[in-house]
Amino acid sequence: MSNHRIERVGMEIKREVNEILQKKVRDPRVQGVTITDVQMSGDLSLAKVYYTIMSDLASDNQKVQIGLEKAKGTIKRELGKNLTMYKIPDLTFIKDESIEYGNKIDQMLRDLEKRN
């Protein structure tokens, strides 16, 4: 399957999941979750959904992960209504560490700048 189609489907799923989390999922554990990326498998049967949250607390991270797993059925059902795909991919939610990593590097650079 063409990479262009895989990327398009991933972008569409990202947009839809963000909207579903904001409008359809009422679980307070997933409030403030932002979907940052979706990586699709080559056959479009699996989607790795990367997310961030505003809190740095480990307990909040765990609560969000549990909330997303509980909401997975609702999210897939809504994706089925909104997307014209034969089969909706299985969703795997993964916390996106790249923003925290970038913030850590920025802080290290600021600390170096202060020393000089």
UniProtKB/Swiss-Prot annotation:
Question: Could you give one GO CC term from the UniProt record?
Answer: cytosol
**Protein's cellular compartments:** Cytoplasm
Keyword ATP-binding set for record:
no
Q: Which GO terms describe its molecular function?
A: ribosomal small subunit binding
Q: What Gene3D superfamilies is this protein classified in?
A: 3.30.300.20
Q: What is its main location?
A: cytoplasm
Q: Which residues form a coiled coil?
A: none
Q: Which InterPro entries match?
A: KH_dom-like_a/b (IPR015946), RbfA (IPR000238), RbfA_dom_sf (IPR023799), Ribosome-bd_factorA_CS (IPR020053)
What SUPFAM superfamilies does this protein map onto? Ribosome-binding factor A, RbfA
User: Biological process GO annotation list?
Assistant: maturation of SSU-rRNA
Q: Does the keyword Cytoplasm apply?
A: yes
Which Pfam families does this entry report, sorted A to Z?
RBFA
Entry keywords, A to Z: Cytoplasm, Ribosome biogenesis
Q: Which residues cross the membrane?
A: none
* Subunit (UniProt): Monomer. Binds 30S ribosomal subunits, but not 50S ribosomal subunits or 70S ribosomes.
Q: What does this protein do?
A: One of several proteins that assist in the late maturation steps of the functional core of the 30S ribosomal subunit. Associates with free 30S ribosomal subunits (but not with 30S subunits that are part of 70S ribosomes or polysomes). Required for efficient processing of 16S rRNA. May interact with the 5'-terminal helix region of 16S rRNA.
- Tell me its family: Belongs to the RbfA family.
The record's listing under NCBIfam families reads: rbfA
Protein name as it appears in the record: Ribosome-binding factor A
